């Protein structure tokens, strides 16, 4: 889906991406990069001292930005990712989900840096507006340990395991990876094994 064959979470600055594309694609632009003072690659945004500016109306804090690559990947399906609530991308739900059941299932997966709790909510906009949704809320317990894309994969696999075709798995193919990923979810392959296959392709 992206404009270049790079990992979703590439950890490169805009200047590094510009240099990469300029070289790899033979663009030949006369780039001038102004280096930032005091910048450290390992620093989180809230450690920079800069004021947070919402990159999107539905991404209002750092936890939402951290969870977005995984939770946003399953947004195209028939569930709410919390748009129309105060905490988009920190929760998911649908009228057909059993929140306590899904929370138990996800917590048994021992997801790095995340704990999952059941909740109910009614979105004021977007999917399921005004409907009561059962679902789960993601609490970030260790942001350095969170693997957001794997989280999205684990959530998709758990939804398919628990609810089968009630969950529109086909709708997430474009954002979750590939048809092969969906086939492996349907076959019951462990999500960590599927994600390991992605890592092999990054080299």
Language model segments and positions:
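Structural motif
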Residues: 31-32, 89-90, 114
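Intrinsically disordered, low-complexity boundary segments flanking structured domains
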Residues: 17-24, 76-79, 102-106, 122-126
């Amino acid at each position: 889906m992206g404009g270049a064959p790079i990992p979703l979470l590439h950890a490169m600055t805009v200047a590094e991406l510009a240099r990469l594309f300029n070289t790899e694609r033979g663009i030949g632009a006369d780039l001038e990069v102004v280096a930032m003072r005091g910048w450290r690659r390992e620093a989180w945004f809230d450690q920079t001292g800069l004021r947070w500016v919402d990159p999107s109306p539905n991404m209002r804090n750092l936890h939402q930005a951290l969870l977005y690559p995984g939770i946003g990947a399953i947004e195209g399906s028939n569930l709410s990712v919390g748009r129309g609530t105060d905490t988009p991308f920190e929760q998911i739900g649908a009228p057909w989900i059993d929140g306590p059941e899904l929370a138990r299932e996800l917590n048994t997966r021992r997801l790095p840096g995340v704990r999952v709790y059941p909740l109910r909510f009614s979105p004021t906009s977007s999917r399921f507006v005004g409907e009561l949704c059962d679902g789960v809320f993601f609490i970030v317990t260790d942001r350095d340990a969170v693997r957001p894309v794997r989280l999205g994969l684990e959530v998709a696999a758990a939804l398919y395991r628990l609810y089968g075709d009630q969950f529109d798995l086909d709708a997430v193919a474009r954002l979750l990876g590939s048809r092969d990923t969906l086939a492996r979810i349907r076959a019951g392959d462990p999500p960590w094994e599927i994600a390991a296959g992605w890592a092999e392709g990054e080299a």
